[in-house]
Amino acid sequence: MVDIKKYFLQKSMTRVMVDEFLAKEYYNAEYAGSEISKTPMGTRVTIYAGRPAIIIGKDGKTIKRLAQILEKYFNLENPQITVTQPEKPELNARVMAFRLAVTLEKGYHFRRAAFMTIRRIMNAGALGAEVIVSGKITSERAKFEKLKEGIVYKTGNNLDVMVDRAIAIATLKMGIYGVEVVITKPLRTIDKISLKQTAGTSTGGESGEVRVTNVRIIDETQNVKLEEQLGGAENDQKSQ
C-alpha cells in the first residue's frame, strides 16, 4: 500500500527541485516559474519565461536536452515541455529580478539599472515597486541600497494577496550582488468600496470610489431593545 503522505511529499520535493534547477539554468531567459501535471501520455511541464526562445533553442535542441535531463535526473515520465511567456512580464517579480541581475552583469551601474526596473514596473500599471541591491556596490565594504516608488505593503492581508516578491544573484568581478524585487500588483484593495447610483437617481451612470478609514460597528440588538422599551412606555400612557 502506498503511503499517501510520502507520495505527496515526494511530488512536492520533485516540483521544488525542478523549479530550482530551471531558475539556476535559465535565469538569463528571465525564468518566471513552472507547472507540472500528470497526463495519460506522460508528464506535462509548462515553463513561463520572459524570453522563451532561449529555452527552446535553435531547432528545439535546448528543449530536447532539457526533456532528457528532466526524465533522467528528476524521474519525470515522458516529459512534454511547453514554454510560454507570462501575460505581463513586467508585473512578475521573478522576471524583473532576473532581468535586473542580467543587466548588472552586463556592466550597468546598479542605481541606473534599478531605476530602469522600477520605471518599467510602474509603466505596466503596478501600484508600487521596491528594488534592493546589496553587495560591494560603492566600496570594498558590503552595503545595500533600497529604491522605492508607490505603495508597497509590508504586513496584513494585502501583503499575501497583492505583493509579489523575488530574489536573484548577479555575479560580477567585485563579487556577488544580491537583488530583491517587490511588486504591488494592480488589484483592488479591501478598503475601497464602489458606490453605484440607481437608475432613478443617476444622471450619467457615474460611479465613484471611497476609501474607508474608520469603521464603527453598530449593535442592532440594542436598537431593537430600545424600540421595544419605547413602545411599551407609549402603550402604558395610552392605557392610563
From Swiss-Prot:
Keyword annotations of the record:
Ribonucleoprotein, Ribosomal protein, RNA-binding, rRNA-binding
By its UniProt entry, which SMART domains does this protein fall under? KH
Q: Where is the KH type-2 domain?
A: 18-97
Q: Does the record bear Ribonucleoprotein in its keywords?
A: yes
> What does UniProt give as GO cellular component?
cytosolic small ribosomal subunit
Recorded hits in SUPFAM superfamilies, A to Z, give:
Prokaryotic type KH domain (KH-domain type II), Ribosomal protein S3 C-terminal domain
Keyword Ribosomal protein on entry: yes
Q: Which GO terms describe its biological process?
A: translation
GO MF: rRNA binding; structural constituent of ribosome
Family annotation (PROSITE patterns): KH_TYPE_2
- Which Gene3D superfamilies does this chain map to? 3.30.300.20, Ribosomal protein S3, C-terminal domain
Purpose = Binds the lower part of the 30S subunit head.
Q: Which family does it belong to?
A: Belongs to the universal ribosomal protein uS3 family.
Q: What is the protein name given in its UniProt record?
A: Small ribosomal subunit protein uS3
Q: Which classification does the entry list for the species?
A: Archaea, Thermoproteota, Thermoprotei, Sulfolobales, Sulfolobaceae
Name the gene behind this protein: rps3
